[in-house]
């Protein structure tokens, strides 16, 4: 059951990434048709922008992410229990030992970052380290180490980059169209008006950014389910992970502001959105995550 869930989540993520590139191609073709006079040129340009954006974000320094989240690196002497759990989970996962960080915050949370296992790092809040027992902490760290092993950080970064590229291209295309940079009316008469293509292009311009955001959220949620399942694979203790999630669910929001890109990295959404904003959670509901673990 565990390996079936892991395989299913991986397949769903691949499908979502394909959908993402289709959205990028659609918005590029739309801008090309409406503004540049060539949908082929717009399509190719959009894909190039998306790839460049993704590659540049992947190679951002781990230190930058840690600095943005007010995390400080600790040694084995400063936090021996925490350090040894990270070491144990990394050994079981067969990845290099990540760097270990602490965030001074009373909320219960943790995250991992790094484009590959060789330059990865794990961070946990002081609140998490104070409240969790060893089994629960192993579940949380196993979750973060699984993100590293499964290259989730890289996938999430690509998703953020592609969503940003779609929004950027849509914004530029809309402005150019609004300020008169669109196709000449003569062009439309020459090709018979092609009303359906025109309507599709305009709808793509409007709806693609929203669709990209929803796909990004779906990818993030699938990776959280996968990391939960992978953590249980490492610890062989589903109850430890379930107990940790129950405590995370009762946690208060982070005490310092967290930007949207960083929020997606945490094991528990640090902003604790409510109402309509919860529809745009980067994380699946904790109740759903617990339910999945109970059915393993």
UniProtKB/Swiss-Prot annotation:
GO terms for biological process: proteolysis. Zn(2+) binds at residues 143, 147, 224. It is found in: Cell membrane. Its cofactor is Zn(2+). It is a multi-pass membrane protein. The chain crosses the membrane at residues 14-34, 39-59, 158-178, 195-215. Its EC number is 3.4.24.-. GO terms for cellular component: plasma membrane. The active site is at 144. Belongs to the peptidase M48B family. NCBIfam families: PRK04897.1. This is Protease HtpX homolog. It comes from Streptococcus agalactiae serotype III (strain NEM316). The lineage of its organism: Bacteria, Bacillati, Bacillota, Bacilli, Lactobacillales.
